[in-house]
Amino acid sequence: DDRLASFSSTGPTVEGFVKPEVVAPGGHVLGLMGTNTTIAITHPEYHDGGAYFTMSGTSQAAGVVTGIVALMLQHSPWLTPDEVKCRLLSSSQLAIDGEGNLAYSLFQQGAGLVDAYAAVYSETTGCANQGLDVAKDLAGIEHYCGRARRDEYGNYTIEGLDTFLWNDAFLWNDAFL
């Protein structure tokens, strides 16, 4: 239905990272499900009585993103996890309203709606997880926090910038976060 679900999580995280990183179709997704499953029995109104069931949630959106990643790796099997993330983020499209403004804040849509074709054929590199070293973080040497902050009025901003993140959407896609 091309709308952000009312139950979608929003960011930033406690550690100041923008979440979600991307969004994908996950509402009212028609999928295969047997008639004898607990969900089908508990909610027959969503089951067609045959092989299909309508569901919504991150479990549905995760399948869409996973499918795109599988296509990316089939096309370019040498991609590292950071390169996959970079291409997935940089190829996503922000939701824009009829007046050319963001339909949702970047704390609601991240880099935007995933685009399978653009992600598979992207050649973008070096834009995900810059400077993050998980080994140092786990060893307690260096801890990483995002730049998102909440002010005393409840507004989210990005540390070091004079404007709100959702007014400067390019910051996300150009990997300055």
Language-model features and meaning:
Residues 3, 105-177:
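Secreted peptidase-domain scaffold signal
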Residues 26-105:
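Hydrolase catalytic cores
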Residues 8, 12-16, 54-62, 74-78, ...:
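Hydrophobic alpha-helical scaffolding
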Residues 1-32, 89-93, 110:
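Catalytic-core segments of hydrolase enzymes
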Residues 12-14, 27-29, 34-37, 60, ...:
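Short, glycine-/Ser/Thr-/acidic-enriched flexible segments
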